[in-house]
């Protein structure tokens, strides 16, 4: 990015994050912008996202992911106050996992994807951005095992809700929540949820600069 464009993008990012209740420090803003540059660079070769315009990346990727961060952070810190852990399923180019890891350095973020080139990108992001609280895993989430479990398991563009809970639900810590990021309210998907799962809440998100519907669907095991 040219210096003027970079300054404008930084100002827009800072204002957007503040509107979302995320007063980020300078180093966090720098890391988010560096992540966007990495995403655009790798995208030219590996096709990580269909969005290529820098302005659209800011709203559709960075701010869209950051909009979910306050709620995800609140939930996981409540469930795991000592060592908060979030699993991002089908993370792709690191959304929402990388923005979450940058905004919340106290939260451990694991990102899983079945496409090796995407997890290679996530590994590169961890190294270049110095994200010691983030890690990536290449493979199928249903084959993962974890003795502790994750306080929050999230996904942004992974699958329908029934597949989300079926494939990843075994990794949830006691008292944990599954948080799906969706566009329009997914009533049809909710109706297809399998037995043993219940919708705790459906929360509408407002993303600065993005005039589109966004919802968080928060799921919990039912008694």
Curated annotation (Swiss-Prot):
Listed EC numbers: 2.1.1.170
Catalytic activity: guanosine(527) in 16S rRNA + S-adenosyl-L-methionine = N(7)-methylguanosine(527) in 16S rRNA + S-adenosyl-L-homocysteine
Keywords annotated in UniProt: Cytoplasm, Methyltransferase, rRNA processing, S-adenosyl-L-methionine, Transferase
GO MF term list: rRNA (guanine-N7-)-methyltransferase activity
GO cellular component: cytosol
Transmembrane segment boundaries: none
Signal peptide coordinates: none
Main localisation: cytoplasm
The keyword Transferase appears for this protein: yes
Compartments where located: Cytoplasm
Residues involved in S-adenosyl-L-methionine binding: 90, 95, 141-142, 156
InterPro entries: rRNA_ssu_MeTfrase_G (IPR003682), SAM-dependent_MTases_sf (IPR029063)
PANTHER family (UniProt xref): S-ADENOSYL-L-METHIONINE-DEPENDENT METHYLTRANSFERASES SUPERFAMILY PROTEIN
Protein family (similarity comment): Belongs to the methyltransferase superfamily. RNA methyltransferase RsmG family.
HAMAP family: 16SrRNA_methyltr_G
Functional description taken from the UniProt entry: Specifically methylates the N7 position of guanine in position 527 of 16S rRNA.
Name the record gives this protein: Ribosomal RNA small subunit methyltransferase G
Organism encoding this protein: Ralstonia nicotianae (strain ATCC BAA-1114 / GMI1000)
Gene name linked to the record: rsmG
